[in-house]
Amino acid sequence: VRNPVLAIVFVAAVGYGFFNALGHGRSDKPMAIPAAAPGASQTAPRAMTENVVAYSTEDKAMQAAKNKGHSTLPRFHELMAAGTPGTYTVKFPLTQNGATEHIWMQLTGLGDGTFIGLLADEPVNGTKYKMGDRMTVAEADVEDWMVKNGGEVYGGYTVRQAFADMPKEQAAKYGITFKD
């Protein structure tokens, strides 16, 4: 039976290395998905750590956010071509040990239909990959993108959804202004 929950890491929105600084221990086993809160829907988002949220694969709002992220990749290319200042990242599914997480990669280059970069987060589902590993990701596999310059962010549709799902005061702590 396939696990109906996926992990969304939104560390790149709050700063690279922050997740690693929280003391996340690397393990060869996938992180356990916590049970839903009493009385909550079985598809409700579930906090796994301070900066990792588990979403059901059936969560329509998060799926819509991923679809928007992918469908707006032409805007990401426009911002790159215009030389918009900031850190450029893309989110993609990373599978290891039979579990998939959705993780950010900081771009260092472009290939023919691919993005090249460094993992911006510490993967939670195993030890095969680590933050800073060089990766090449097909554009077809990209689920979201961001250009982050200080507190201003273009894109980041899955992060927007994660913020919408948390208490407003918690989201406000991150000081992010989304632009389009």
Per-region residue spans from a language model:
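Mixed-charge, low-complexity intrinsically disordered regions
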Residues: 2-104, 108-180
